[in-house]
Every structure is written in C-alpha cells, then in structure tokens.
C-alpha cells in the first residue's frame, strides 16, 4: 500500500507521538508498504528520503512544540500526483485538519490517530473554559475521518462517551530486549550518590505541567519525611519547560536530562520504583 502520514511531530523529536509513529512507520516499511511522512518543521525541504517538511510555527508557550499550518493546497497537489491508498493523520493541528479536508475532497480514505488528550491540557495551562470547545473541535475533526485508532480499550470507551465515532483499538508494545532488568548498572546508581541499599524513585518523561510532576516529586518528599531512616533517592529523567522550576523546588533530586535508547534503558533498570502521576495520558510511552 501507499500510505501518507501527516504529523506535527516525528523522530528525532522525543515524545510519545514521535516514538509511536517512528515504530509504526518502521514496521509498515519492513512489511513492504510505501510510507511517506509529511511533518511539521520550521525549515523547508526534506529530512530524509520518505519525509517532507511542512510549514509550521512554534507553540508560543512551549517553543519545542511545532504546530503545523494549513496546507490543503500542498496536500492536494501531492495526492493528485501520487495518490495514496490511505492517509493517516496523527495530530489535530491546522495542518492535520487541512489534510483531512484535502483527502476527503479527493476521496482518499482517511484514518486518524488519537494520541493526545489535548482538551485535558487546558486546565494545566489556565484555559479551563476552553476545554469543552477543544472537545467539540476534536470530535468534529475525528468524526470526519473514516476511522480513528486509539491505543487502549479504555480510551475507546472514553471517546465513545464523548460522541466520537468509528473507533478502533491499535495497541502498543514494549521492546523487552531493550528494556531489560539485566541492564541494571551499579556504577550508574553510584553516580547518583546512591548507597547500596537505598531505594531509587524515578520519574521519566517530558518536564511539563500536564505531566503532574509536582505531585510525583511531592510524594517522594512526603515519604522522606515519614520514613527518615529509610535511604532513598529521587531521579528525574527528561527535559522540558519545567526543568528549572523543578530543580529549585526539589534540590535533592538528581536531574539526568534527556536520555535515549540503551542509555534510557540503563536508567530505567537502575531505578527501584517508577512514579508516573500524569492524568492526561492516552498511553504512557
């Protein structure tokens, strides 16, 4: 099949959507499908063979995040020349909405992915009054697609309750070869200042408001107070706009920055307890 993927984020971006799409595209190509990725970027041209950069702007409050701009004419021009068998739209930006419109105009089948609970982000960024409007926008856009795929049955039921139609579950997996307890590294734990019997609590992910990180690190602080004789250490893996404020609020924590691949797997394996407090996930990658 000839498949075009439209997305605001893709590898080497570090987030759940980019990670999921990288695996999806790689798996489809391994099976012989022709996959082309049309991705938001602030630069023109192509990244790699099989990728096209599309116009975008950085999100004002979060410059690492790119928002794709409406590009219906570019989509129509490409798809009239190289008609895909199906278009997969992964993000609901103006670019994503214009891709749905262009595909429907040309009668090209459209599948959307529901990767992010953007409507739930509203309260984290002080726009609670816009949550209903965000849900309405997402529902209207997704219901224009032939199908919306979601990562879990729970997510399917939630969206169905909000009026989303034609939902199907496309599950996720974990690379059990990469993320293996055998990668536990005593020297890494020592570099964190951990004694042999101390318990390492870990937080991994984007350091942003919607991840509820203050709750996770606050729990660790509470445990320290309630069990002062128990050795423990807090390790934070990731980067994002809250890095500096979290460093100030939790000076005893070890901040490791962004990690990838085998290095990330070593960090996971060196932890004893993972704290994951986000309430906005569709599927925590």
What are these regions (language model features)?
Residues 279:
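Aromatic "clamp/platform" in nucleotide-sugar-dependent glycosyltransferases that forms part
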Residues 227, 243-263, 273:
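Nucleotide-activated donor-binding/catalytic signature segment of Leloir-type glycosyltransferases, i.e.
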Residues 39, 53, 131, 135-185, ...:
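Donor nucleotide-sugar binding/catalytic pocket of nucleotide-sugar-dependent glycosyltransferases
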Residues 1-55:
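N-terminal subdomain of nucleotide-sugar transferases
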Residues 75-96, 100, 106-111:
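Short N-terminal targeting/anchoring amphipathic segment
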Residues 194-222:
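Conserved donor-binding/catalytic core segment of Leloir-type glycosyltransferases
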Residues 104, 114, 118-147:
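A conserved, positively charged/aromatic
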Residues 21, 28, 201, 216-220, ...:
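A structural motif in glycosyltransferase catalytic domains
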């Amino acid at each position: 099949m000839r498949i075009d993927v439209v997305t605001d984020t893709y590898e080497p971006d570090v987030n759940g959507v980019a990670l999921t799409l990288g695996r999806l595209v790689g798996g489809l190509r391994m099976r012989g499908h022709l996959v082309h990725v049309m991705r938001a970027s602030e630069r023109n041209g192509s990244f790699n063979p099989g990728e096209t950069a599309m116009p975008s702007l950085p999100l004002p409050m979060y410059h690492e995040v790119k928002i794709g701009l409406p590009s219906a004419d570019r989509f129509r021009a490409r798809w009239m020349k190289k008609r895909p068998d199906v278009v997969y739209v992964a993000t609901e930006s103006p670019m994503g909405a214009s891709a749905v419109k262009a595909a429907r105009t040309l009668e090209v089948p459209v599948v959307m992915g529901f990767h992010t609970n953007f409507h739930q982000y509203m309260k984290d960024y002080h726009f609670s009054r816009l949550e209903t409007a965000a849900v309405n926008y997402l529902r209207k856009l997704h219901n224009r697609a032939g199908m919306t795929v979601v990562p879990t049955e729970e997510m399917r039921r939630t969206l169905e309750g909000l009026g989303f139609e034609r939902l199907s579950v496309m599950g996720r997996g974990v690379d059990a070869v990469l993320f293996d307890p055998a990668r536990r590294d005593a020297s890494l734990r020592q570099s964190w200042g951990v004694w042999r019997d101390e318990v390492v609590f870990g937080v991994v992910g984007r350091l942003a408001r919607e991840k509820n990180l203050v709750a996770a690190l606050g729990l660790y602080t509470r445990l320290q107070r309630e069990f002062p004789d128990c050795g423990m250490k807090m390790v934070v893996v990731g980067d994002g706009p809250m890095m500096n404020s979290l460093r100030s609020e939790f000076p005893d924590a070890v901040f490791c920055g962004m990690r990838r691949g085998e290095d990330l797997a070593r960090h996971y394996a060196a932890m004893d307890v993972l704290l994951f407090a986000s309430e906005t996930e569709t599927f925590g990658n």
